[in-house]
Amino acid sequence: MRKIFIILICLLIASPAFAGKAKKSPLYKLQKQLGNGEMISIPSYSTTSFIGIHKGWYKESPITVEALLTLPPGDGPFPVLMITHSSGGPLEFAADWLEFMRDQQKPLLDMGIGTFYLDNFSARGVKDTYRDQSTVTLFSAYIDSFMALEFLANHPKVNKKKIGITGYSRGGNNSLMIQEKKIRDALVDKSLYFAAAQPRSPECYAAAMFENPTPIPETKVWLVHGGADDYTLPGPCVEYGKKVKANGGDIKIDVREGWYHTFTGNYAVEKSPALIFHRCPPVYSKDNGQWDDEAVNYIVKHGPFESREDFELAQKEDPRAAWKGMFKAMKKAKCIDKGVHEGGDHGKEFMPEYLKFWKDNLL
């Protein structure tokens, strides 16, 4: 792996205030590499977890994120694919070790599909989160995706019924959770939806997904996971997919035997000293945004919090302390392990079926 990731649980309750001064987006470099595209500013918000969306706390933390939009020649309206990054940040769009991110653009444009590279980090003063996942939360990225969807839906050259989204790892979570009504309905008009999503290798065990998912039926999801992935385990995603399907969602879970995390990276499988929490309790969100009892009771038992109420108050008023307390609890309970595998150089092998998915669902 070209980076060291820290598993997603650390970012679930992070404070939007942790972000520093906005950085110049690597999308400007990507724009030069690709030789096309228009830089776009998207008004958005930051939050801690779903409870911040559910209770409207996110409105107190506005922010403007950037994206790179490229449309095929002509008047349109065109379908558009939103491409999101992992914990490595938007620099990976231009990285030598992840050519897949750029190689998809030309064939997509040739098919008549526009591209929209979304930067969740730079506006929040963050380069990447693999060194400290507490700096940008997953749920902030979900907000960005829906704000970007709203922008694209109002663009005169975009077909608002043919917008897709994709990404891997953290970007895989971003691409999976846009199928959730509870998030969509709290943020944008209920008539808006992504036509299709292609998440890869999301974290489904400790990412505060919903105990009771309420999927948007119009969104078709094709989730691809490596069967050998020891970083973000495929099993919890298979089980989550069953819940989504049982509740009316259009989802296919595709587990590839022998594939590891970051399987589209153009490098051989290698060991990474990443922290993993597979022996800690899973974390799920209830409909009201609260975490499940098992996870919270575990944190209260081993951490500095006296009760659920104490923990949730910290999430709102001092998220940094909440995160530190949670991590301290996991460390004290000795449920944290270290060491995963990444890579595999399957990008070129995967590309034809990946492009076919977009041809079938956005054209």
Residue ranges and their predicted role:
Residues 189-258:
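The feature captures the conserved acid-bearing segment of alpha/beta-hydrolase catalytic domains
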Residues 87, 169-172:
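Active-site loop->helix "elbow" adjoining a glycine-rich segment at hydrolase catalytic centers
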